[in-house]
Each structure stands twice: as C-alpha cells, then as structure tokens.
C-alpha cells in the first residue's frame, strides 16, 4: 500500500490522505467529509503534470469522469507510476502543459473532457460535467456556459468531485469562470472531426465516402452538445411544446420536458434549465382575455451573454387546445408521478403546460389574489416602469410586474406605498403613480401611468393585506383645480386679445364675399385641411396597436371616427 499526505481532491478546500492499494485507491479528508473510493477496475488512464499545489495525478475513470489529485511532490512520481503499473496495469503518462500563452490552438474531444491544445500540449481542459449549456453566438463563434455552484451547503457537506456530483467541482471559490467563447473559422469534413471519434475507424471509413463539408463552428457545437449531454436524449423526452412565444427572453422556443430538466430550443439560443432552479411559478391572466402568462422565477438566472433573466415569461392563448400523450412508462407514472401527472391531456395548452411543469418540478402554482379586482374586472393593472409598459399583478403575499423588467416584491418587505401624481397639468388627474418603499433601506420601485379608476380597488387591497399606504393625491386636488381654472382664464383672455388685434379682419369675417364660390376651395383651405389631417388619428392608431389591452382606447377610436366624418372632402386642383 502506498500513502500520500496533504493531497487535494478535485480542487477541494481541505487536504486529505490518498492511499493506493491493489483493490483500488481512496481519499479521506483531514476534517469532516465523506471518503472517496475508486475501484481498480474503474481506472482507465492516468496522467502526471504540474499543477497549482505541486504536481497533479489525473485519473480518467471508466464511469466516474475525471478525478484530479493535486499536491504531490515531484519525487512521488516513481512510487505512483510503479503502483499503477503493477496493480492496475496502466502506464502513468507524464504531460507538460503549454505555457506560451497563445489563445489559438486545437480543440480535442476526449471521453470525459474538452482539451484545448497548443503545439500538441494541453493549455487547459474542461470536463463535460462542468458544461451547462452551449450556443452558436455567431457564424464562427461558439459560447460555452459553465455550471455554477448554487448550493454552498451541499458543496461543503460532500467531498468535491465525488461520484455523487458527476465530477462537478462543488467546492468552488467566490470567483469562478462562467463563460468562454471559441472562434472557429472555416469548414471541415464531418467524418474527420465528429464521426471518427464517436464511431471508430471502421465506421469512419464507410462515412468518408459519403462525407460532406460542414461549417467548423457548427460541427464543434454539435459535438459539444452531444458530449455534454445538452441536446436531445432519445427516449428521455416526456413532452414537447412547439413554437411557444416567450416575452422574456424575447423569441419563440420549443420546450422539451425531461425528468430533471427542460430545454428551450430557439433559432439562435438553446437553454437547459434544471427544475431545481425554479423557485417561483406564476399563472397570470392577461387583461385582453385572450392570453395568459406563465412566469418562472429562476435561481440561478438564465444567462444570455452578459444579460441575466431571473424570470422566464411565456405567453399562451386561452382558446388553443392540444392533445398530448406523455412519453412515459406506466411503471414510472405509478411509482414516481402518481397523482402528479396524467398519461394523457386534452385541454387548453396553458393548462397542460402548467400541470406538467407543476408535476415535474413539484412547485406550487401562484395565482392572483382574490382580494383584488381592477375597475374593469381584471387581475392586472396596466402601468409602466420608466419607459417599459406592462401589467402589475397583486398576489396574496407579493406583487409582480411583467414582462420587462420582471419585478417581484414580497408584501412582508414593503414598508409603505405612496400614491401620488406627477406634474401639475390637468392631464395628470387621469393617471397616478405608486411608489413601493421597501424595509431596511432595500430601495423602492415606482409604477407610473396607472388609470385613475384603479385608485379605489388598490386602496381596498392594501387595507385587506394590512399594507401601509399614503394617498398624496388629495393634497394636489386644489393645485390641479387652480391650474385648470388658470388655463381657462388664460385661454379666454388670449381669444379676446386675438380678436382685438385683428382689427378690421372681424368685419371681413362677418361680411359676405360676393367673389367666393362654394364649389371651389382656395389653396389656403387645402393647406389647413392638410394640416388637420396630418395631426389626426395616425399616432393614436399606432399607440392602440402597440398597447396590450386594446379595450382602454375605445374613446380615442370614437373621436378619430367622428373627426373623419366631419372632415370635408378635398377636391383636387385642376390646372387651367
């Protein structure tokens, strides 16, 4: 038996003792933690190289991924290589890392990791178990997202890199790499890079005759998806929903539902999300009575480059029905998902998506509070955060604004809500703002342009939930009335002033012009008609099309129709 002290397993924070025997090897931490063991039959290959804490022994196991043992002395190489040769029948390969610092080289897909080589020497390796997602960021660019450590308690409870974690380096530090990008220009033969490594030499020879040229970045992306098990796994998809509209992130995605995760497949980006990342699950009806929103609160948030999306917002039609049969065995349905899922669904799509997400994730569905109904009988209130228009929903224990920027506020964190108007114009009386101030100096959120008719329903909801609120609008009533009266007085005085300045023009207005013919219009009349038409309903129609509700702008539409009816018909000029 060979024993080595002060050895670190898979970047663990504490050292331990490593022992080698004929039956296998083991590592035991010096403090608390579980002992890691590896059977001799599971040792596939071994590599020796310089590392962070001295020299490292990397073991490529047959079924447990990559195992890294760091902290050896240079003199330990002879003992290790002799033990591996005698007990496991394996030669320990001594490898030197590339130290030139070049950022170009060759990517090699091995059994358990992606290796980036410079001049045939490894610069760095990325285990497939550390890769959470990959996307084509451009024509010749591939983005690789690395898995994040989200549960520090579990990381400290288990030895880093144990087989329970599938080789994950759970004991990561506060700073860690989350994304890297590869620029891969040109084209390659598919058989040279993909099929050869996957199916071996015999099948590769057959494929070479039918080989076709393919974009190198696309082939790299497909290989990485397959190696890291990010893409489709045959037979594992329980259900698939096609072309689902997502408001955040914006686009249409196909949703593939798996046992422990779901995948969003879009034209540009693909996402793989664990059900354990779903912290909140909302079902929110829109005010148009034709759509509903399904909102998933994610932690860690979804990442798209430097942009993070803590909420996933999808929009579904209420009247769209589907028939779906789950791709699941009866045994699995009875043992694990009994009373959670049904073998077959035939109902509106938003209900099917909700039930399957709830059954697979185990999360409770949160719906709008019964204590709040808007003036128009809806669950949401139309408002804005800065320039972004959306809907604010009032739930039993929280408030949520969707779709962008999705904002979630817990009722228990609210210190006071202030209802106020902005500005002194008469138009301000039609809308008001609410400012939600949070406790312990956590900041505030302002929601603007709320319809004046929603004041009473909001006050009743705040009283029902014992939320402190302050109404500052009553203090502004006198100022608004004075402003309105001033506007009327100024308007009338202006009219009198204009009439006084016109002089004899008033007499011309009342007298009959004998030269005027009713059948013809002057150039001046056409000019004024043209100006009137350009300032008409064009902008209003665009605003109505852009609005979500649609029903709140009926008055504007009526005004537009009336103005069009009263407008005289223009007659074209005829040259003499």
From Swiss-Prot:
This is FACT complex subunit pob3. It comes from Aspergillus oryzae (strain ATCC 42149 / RIB 40). Residues 204-213, 506-528, 542-564 have a biased composition (Acidic residues). Residues 193-203, 496-505 have a biased composition (Basic and acidic residues). One of its GO terms (biological process) is DNA repair. Keywords: Chromosome, DNA damage, DNA repair, DNA replication, Nucleus, Transcription, Transcription regulation. It is found in: Nucleus; Chromosome. InterPro entries: PH-like_dom_sf, RTT106/SPT16-like_middle_dom, RTT106/SSRP1_HistChap/FACT, SSRP1-like_PH1, SSRP1/POB3, SSRP1/POB3_N, SSRP1_DD, SSRP1_sf. GO terms for cellular component: chromosome, telomeric region; FACT complex. PANTHER family: FACT COMPLEX SUBUNIT SSRP1 (PTHR45849:SF1). In contrast to the orthologous protein in animals and plants, this protein does not contain a HMG box DNA-binding domain. This function may instead be provided by the HMG box of the associated nhp6 protein in the FACT complex of fungi. SMART domains: Rtt106. It comes from the Eukaryota. Residues 153-172, 193-213, 490-576 are annotated as: Disordered. Forms a stable heterodimer with spt16. The spt16-pob3 dimer weakly associates with multiple molecules of nhp6 to form the FACT complex. The gene is pob3. It holds the Pfam family POB3_N.
């Amino acid at each position: 038996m060979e024993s080595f002290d002060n050895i670190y397993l898979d970047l663990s924070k504490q050292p331990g003792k490593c022992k080698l025997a004929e039956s296998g090897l083991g590592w035991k931490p010096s403090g608390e933690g579980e002992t890691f063991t590896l059977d001799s039959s599971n040792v596939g290959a071994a590599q020796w190289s310089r590392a962070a804490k001295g020299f490292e022994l990397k073991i490529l196991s047959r079924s447990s991924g990559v195992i890294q043992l760091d902290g050896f002395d240079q003199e330990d190489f002879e003992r290790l290589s002799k033990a591996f040769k005698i007990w496991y029948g394996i030669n320990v390969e001594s490898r030197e890392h590339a130290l030139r610092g070049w950022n170009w080289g060759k990517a090699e897909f091995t059994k358990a990791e992606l290796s980036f080589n410079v001049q045939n020497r490894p610069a760095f390796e990325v285990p497939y178990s550390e890769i959470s997602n990959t996307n084509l960021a451009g024509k010749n660019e591939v983005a690789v997202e690395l898995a994040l450590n989200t549960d520090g308690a579990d990381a400290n409870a288990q030895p880093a890199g144990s087989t329970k974690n599938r080789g994950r380096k759970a004991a990561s530090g506060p700073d860690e790499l989350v994304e890297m990008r590869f620029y891969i220009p040109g084209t390659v033969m598919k058989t040279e890079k993909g099929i050869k490594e996957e199916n071996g030499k015999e099948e590769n020879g057959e494929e070479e005759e039918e080989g076709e040229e393919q974009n190198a970045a696309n082939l790299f992306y497909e290989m990485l998806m397959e190696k890291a098990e990010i893409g489709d796994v045959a037979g594992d998809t329980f259900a698939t929903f096609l072309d689902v509209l997502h408001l955040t992130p914006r686009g249409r995605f196909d949703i593939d539902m798996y046992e422990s995760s779901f995948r969003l497949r879009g034209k540009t980006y693909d996402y793989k999300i664990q059900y354990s990342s779903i912290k909140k699950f909302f079902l929110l009806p829109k005010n148009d009575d034709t759509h509903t929103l399904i909102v998933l609160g994610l932690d860690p948030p979804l990442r798209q480059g430097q942009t993070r999306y803590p909420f996933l917002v999808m929009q579904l039609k209420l009247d769209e029905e589907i028939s779906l049969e789950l791709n699941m065995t009866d045994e699995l349905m009875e043992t694990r998902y009994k009373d959670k899922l049904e073998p077959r669904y035939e109902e509106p799509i938003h209900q099917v998506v909700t039930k399957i997400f709830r059954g697979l994730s185990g999360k409770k569905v949160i719906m709008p509070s019964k204590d709040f109904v808007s003036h128009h009988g809806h669950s949401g209130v139309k408002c804005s955060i800065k320039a972004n228009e959306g809907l604010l929903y009032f739930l039993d224990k929280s408030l949520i604004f969707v779709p962008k920027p999705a904002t979630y506020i817990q009722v228990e964190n609210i210190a006071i809500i202030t209802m106020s108007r902005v500005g002194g114009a008469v138009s301000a009386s039609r809308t008001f703002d609410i400012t939600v101030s949070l406790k312990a100096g956590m900041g505030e959120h302002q929601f603007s342009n709320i319809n004046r008719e929603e004041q009473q329903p909001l006050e009743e909801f705040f009283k029902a939930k014992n939320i402190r609120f302050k109404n500052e609008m009553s203090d502004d009533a006198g100022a608004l009335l004075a402003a309105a009266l001033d506007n009327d007085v100024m308007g009338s005085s202006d009219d009198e002033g204009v009439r006084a300045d016109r002089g004899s023009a008033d007499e011309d207005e009342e007298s009959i012009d004998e030269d005027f013919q009713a059948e013809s219009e002057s150039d001046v009349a056409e000019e004024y008609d043209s100006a009137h038409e350009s300032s008409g309903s064009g902008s209003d129609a665009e605003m109505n099309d852009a609005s979500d509700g649609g029903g709140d702008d009926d008055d504007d539409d009526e005004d537009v129709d009336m103005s069009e009816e009263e407008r005289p018909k223009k007659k074209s000029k005829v040259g003499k």
